[in-house]
Amino acid sequence: MLIIPAIDLKDGACVRLRQGRMEDSTVFSDDPVSMAAKWVEGGCRRLHLVDLNGAFEGQPVNGEVVTAIAKRYPNLPIQIGGGIRTLETIEHYVRAGVSYVIIGTKAVKEPEFVTEACKAFPGKVIVGLDAKDGFVATDGWAEVSSVQATDLAKRFEADGVSAIVYTDIAKDGMMQGCNVEATAALAAASKIPVIASGGIHNLGDIEKLLLARSPGIIGAITGRAIYEGTLDVAEAQAFCDSFKG
């Protein structure tokens, strides 16, 4: 299982939100490229970037920062989400060296767009499912739909989606533990690999994910915990690599 540091971009800075609220953000760095360097030097094998402004505005806003990080680390798999609503945006990011694009809101509102994107950019598309009580939320979590996360995941199986990033909104940024049960249930319900996100606080939370013994869970995204020092990226990755259960 991969430990994937998150860099959330707002107005060019690296921030963390609580439960997706833009008004409840903490700035951790004014230099996201240097922050990326810190996690790379700490041994991370993939980076998770989110354009928060883009998620709310429906188009990339912090694209230059994303491109700068991708150019600095051409051999590092990078995934980007937030404001990806057109094939042109995907092409821009892929050309910039980004490994994966995460389609969130549009995947819920127009599932056929995921099919198109997977055909145009095979192996490059991740679907981001952000859920509240099992129902998928959209538009920067401002709206909660009537669509179940497990149902939507099954819908994308035939498209060739590389992974699903599953976030439990109630847990995100709160550092109260990941929703292991819901994450494992999603991994069991779908053939698409799942990346857990939201709420990871320490090594104990990583262990709980591993103890779920779900081969479908391939990674865990962590944000506030690594910024506030309750989780060490290198230590957590080493723990995953050596885990025997």
UniProtKB/Swiss-Prot annotation:
Its EC number is 5.3.1.16. The active site is at D8 (proton acceptor), D130 (proton donor). Keywords: Amino-acid biosynthesis, Cytoplasm, Histidine biosynthesis, Isomerase. The keyword Amino-acid biosynthesis applies. Pathway: Amino-acid biosynthesis; L-histidine biosynthesis; L-histidine from 5-phospho-alpha-D-ribose 1-diphosphate: step 4/9. CDD domains: HisA. InterPro entries: Aldolase_TIM, His_biosynth, HisA_bact_arch, Isoase_HisA-like, Isoase_HisA-like_bact, RibuloseP-bd_barrel. The keyword Cytoplasm applies. Its main location: cytoplasm. It catalyses: 1-(5-phospho-beta-D-ribosyl)-5-[(5-phospho-beta-D-ribosylamino)methylideneamino]imidazole-4-carboxamide = 5-[(5-phospho-1-deoxy-D-ribulos-1-ylimino)methylamino]-1-(5-phospho-beta-D-ribosyl)imidazole-4-carboxamide. GO terms for biological process: L-histidine biosynthetic process; L-tryptophan biosynthetic process. It is found in: Cytoplasm. GO terms for cellular component: cytoplasm. GO terms for molecular function: 1-(5-phosphoribosyl)-5-[(5-phosphoribosylamino)methylideneamino]imidazole-4-carboxamide isomerase activity. Belongs to the HisA/HisF family. This is 1-(5-phosphoribosyl)-5-[(5-phosphoribosylamino)methylideneamino] imidazole-4-carboxamide isomerase. The lineage of its organism: Bacteria, Pseudomonadati, Pseudomonadota, Gammaproteobacteria, Pseudomonadales. The gene is hisA.
